[in-house]
Amino acid sequence: RSYPKNLSGNSERDKMDKIYFLSQSTSLILIIVISLVFAVLGLHYSKKFQGINNYLTANRNIGLFSLTTSLVASALGAWILFGPVSAATWGGIGAVIGYALGTAFPMIFLIYFGKKIRSDFPKGASLIEYMRRKFGKSLFKLILLMTIFYMFIFLCAEVTAVAVLINYLSGTELWITALIVLISTLTYTLYGGLRASIFTDNIQMIVIGILLLILISIISSSSGSNFSFEFVESKNPQLLSSSYIPTYTAGLTFFIAVAATNLFHQGNWQRVYAAKNYQTLKISLIISFFIIIPIICLMGFIGMVSFSLDSSVRPDLGFFTLLLKDQTELLSLMIVVLGLSLTISTVDTLVNAISSLFVVDGKATFKLNKYTDYLKISK
């Protein structure tokens, strides 16, 4: 087995004689296997749920467990392994709280607005469709373009994040990871639609939850007394200080940026309509809110601990620095599975969301002849 020469993210890793945690062949096999497993599961499950209603809104019949795991899995992409960890090293506890609240806030917003939109437009499938019918076509195309652009950028960021992660662990070329993940996800998502996305989200969230618990527990136990607010305060008191101005500016910036963009996430609005009733939607959103908050906060705290232990560590690699300090191959394999599960759960949501907008809003946008199959065009 092979190990990296250092964990600092410094230039040494850019030398020709890199040594990694995993061999490229091992990581490549794992990427292919994990991607294929989710693709086969999605394709097999969605065979019995065909039709436009299942593709767009899962026939409006999703229960509490499936809806909750899907909402959380879709919200938590591979970015959680990098973003909050890095932000905590310069923005302190305020950045972490802002990140967490920004990610979870849409769940609270959807409790109230979700009820209204389901009541006013019970047969809908998207926020943009609702806005077009409620307020006219004046801003419709602009909002549609902005929504698709945001989700496309989100999709690119997710695929890039997991590709960078696996490159860091094994040296696998970025395009190889990205291509495998995209092809497998597109295959089952464009075939099975929202049904396939939600079903695979359920499995992915179970995998994500178990692996996060294991990996964070390992970090906590191996760090000992260093895994505490007291240790962070002794090394970098500004990160926990109420008088540290960047903590407020960073927190507010992250909250506004993350919350505002997620409110236009079509994947969330599809799930609002997919819930079998409003009570299921409400409980699911509340549970999702209280699952997301501690996960983001824990990742941010890990970033502060890592930075306090060694300020020379590249900020976005803090999670891996603490976890892989003993250079364990098994942990590297677990990280690959975690990263792929986080990414695929988010990417399938984004792919189906973008596709659904073409189906739902395509007629009003392109105005083709009445026999046009917008579902086929979207695929």
Segments and roles (model prediction):
Residues 40-48, 152-159, 172-180, 184-190, ...:
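Hydrophobic alpha-helical segments and their helix-loop junctions in multi-pass secondary transporters
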Residues 124-132, 193-202, 264-294, 315-318, ...:
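Hydrophobic, small-residue-rich membrane helices and short re-entrant helix-turn-helix hairpins
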Residues 17-82, 189-192, 205, 211, ...:
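Membrane-interface "cap" regions at the ends of multi-pass membrane proteins
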Residues 97-189, 257-258, 339-349:
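Helix-loop-helix module between adjacent transmembrane segments
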Residues 63-71, 105-108, 137-150, 179-181, ...:
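Select transmembrane alpha-helical segments in multipass membrane proteins
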Residues 56-123, 256, 268-311, 321-342:
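Membrane-interface helix-loop-helix modules in multi-pass membrane proteins
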Residues 137-141, 152, 356-379:
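Loop-to-transmembrane helix boundary motifs in multi-pass membrane proteins
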Residues 145-156, 207-218, 249-263, 278-308, ...:
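Selective recognition of specific alpha-helical transmembrane segments in multi-pass small-molecule
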